[in-house]
């Protein structure tokens, strides 16, 4: 069983949902970023969703765009990110690690080289934000060759054929987008048809469903679980904590610890 499969089986046995934080690697710098990861895991993160700094992130709102810029301004590249992942994997052999990134970062070294590197450093799953499920075959084949699970986004406007294709191809987890638009902790609305989407995904035997976009409060985690999701992903709210505490790492890690423990507590019934 993959790490994600094992995680969801264990959580189901405990009647818990998953809380998965997202951060951009090497923001604000390599050492602080690793301490951020340690803090997330120590305070209850069930898995990690990690971004690589990129100059033109498509789905990211201003908060995560700023995180990308901080890491890029510090001179951190894909090489540094893979070095960080290897360090995380060495310290935490069981934690599931997913990447959320843009296709350019996969294409530039070639898909084969990228997914080989993912496998060598301990990545479990990759979600390429700007590759729709209809155009995904070559990516899924390249990922599968190296034992990497391919994750796909289910948008709020997905029709039945798209839902069935997502359910067939996605592995590890399904990323259910709360609403159209870009990531933001401020915009906490979600589409009115999420319950129907979740039902359709489950009927199609989809991988476990994690709801993301705008998840910033424990009540939203509980709501996602009530709707039938298997957990929730929070990114902008976490990156915002980093952004407002750049002058005090102690305060940054303390606030992060509190936030993650409260969000994780909301996954327990």
From Swiss-Prot:
Q: Give the catalysed reaction(s), semicolon-separated.
A: (1S,2R)-1-C-(indol-3-yl)glycerol 3-phosphate + L-serine = D-glyceraldehyde 3-phosphate + L-tryptophan + H2O
Q: What is the uppermost EC class here?
A: lyase
Name the active site residues: 49, 60
Name of a matching Pfam family: Trp_syntA
> Mind telling me which InterPro entries this protein's record contains?
Aldolase_TIM (IPR013785), RibuloseP-bd_barrel (IPR011060), Trp_synthase_alpha_AS (IPR018204), Trp_synthase_suA (IPR002028)
Pathway listed for it is: Amino-acid biosynthesis; L-tryptophan biosynthesis; L-tryptophan from chorismate: step 5/5
What Gene Ontology cellular component terms go with this record? cytosol
Q: What is its EC number?
A: 4.2.1.20
Keywords of the record, alphabetical order, are: Amino-acid biosynthesis, Aromatic amino acid biosynthesis, Lyase, Tryptophan biosynthesis
Q: Which PROSITE patterns match?
A: TRP_SYNTHASE_ALPHA (PS00167)
Question: Which family does the record claim for this protein?
Answer: Belongs to the TrpA family.
Primary role: The alpha subunit is responsible for the aldol cleavage of indoleglycerol phosphate to indole and glyceraldehyde 3-phosphate.
Oligomeric form and interacting partners: Tetramer of two alpha and two beta chains.
Q: What is this protein called?
A: Tryptophan synthase alpha chain
Q: What is the lineage of its organism?
A: Bacteria, Pseudomonadati, Pseudomonadota, Gammaproteobacteria, Pasteurellales
